[in-house]
Amino acid sequence: MGARDFLTLEGCDRGELREILELAAGCEAGRMDGALAGKTVCLAFFEASTRTAVSFELAARRCGADVISLSERGSSISKGESLVDTVVTLDRLGADAIVLRHPAAGAARLAARFAAAAVVNAGDGCGQHPTQALLDLYSLSRSVGGFEELAGVRAAVVGDILHSRVARSVIPAFRAAGVELALVAPRTLLPVEAGVWGLPVLSSVDEALEWGASVLYMLRLQRERMTGARVPSVAEYARYYAVGRRHLEAGVRVMHPGPVNRGVEIAGDVVLDGASLIPDQVAAGVAVRSAVLALATGVAQEVAA
């Protein structure tokens, strides 16, 4: 089977999510080690990244692929070359998969139009971040006792939803898995599509706990993407939308895609608390992204056959 682009989780159903996470569990157990031998994976990261970039590289290497890393500073994009021309170049040089991180929403979909290689969306501006949502589901499912136990779990997505590509992937993925969701954000940080999602909108972390949330999915306040004043002040924002130690008394699990701004969306002493799934989310990155690379290159189907 040939290349399969991996751009979004919109339209992905519960069965498809289960299959991907089962494959990730197999990858974690080592069943895909060396399976990408002879394949070339290009990591084209044109926006800053730590967790996503490192875990994709570790995943590709663990699966046996040859890995090429490209950044804006080290590529002809710094000389004015377009994204399309860069992608075509990587494709013609023989990349089997192009893992793309880009500051513009829709960049991965654009790249996929011009590449025969599989394009994997590693985050495109305020657009999508599908592999993050998958590793979040993987981590949460393990914490509740398995994928089937996700049905009926109540989770609140808290913070800067407007600028969050993670939220735009987490929301459809969690809903497809049966998780009940609510949004917790000031009106100035809600996107237009929030009305289409049809989810309850709450005004504080305290209200989310009253709603019955057992999971608080915290989002970073993305001040670098803001074009104007969206909140009165960081202190005022944290008063309503930050999770502190007192919230842990309700027995909630805390999640965050990273990077964490300690003291803004999460109190510093909560990040590594036993109630925090953040370390588990990071650890899940290699297995989940190994599964995505195996699916994108067609190797997973070949091994299964």
Curated annotation (Swiss-Prot):
What keywords are assigned to this protein? Pyrimidine biosynthesis, Transferase
Gene3D superfamilies with a match to the protein in the record: Aspartate/ornithine carbamoyltransferase
Sites where the protein binds L-aspartate: 79, 165, 220
* Biochemical pathway: Pyrimidine metabolism; UMP biosynthesis via de novo pathway; (S)-dihydroorotate from bicarbonate: step 2/3
The record's EC number reads: 2.1.3.2
According to its record, what are the GO cellular component terms?
A: cytosol
Note the superkingdom of the native organism.
Bacteria
One Gene Ontology biological process: amino acid metabolic process
What family does the entry list?
Belongs to the aspartate/ornithine carbamoyltransferase superfamily. ATCase family.
| Assembly notes | Heterododecamer (2C3:3R2) of six catalytic PyrB chains organized as two trimers (C3), and six regulatory PyrI chains organized as three dimers (R2).
List the protein's name. Aspartate carbamoyltransferase catalytic subunit
**What gene, per UniProt, encodes this protein?**
pyrB
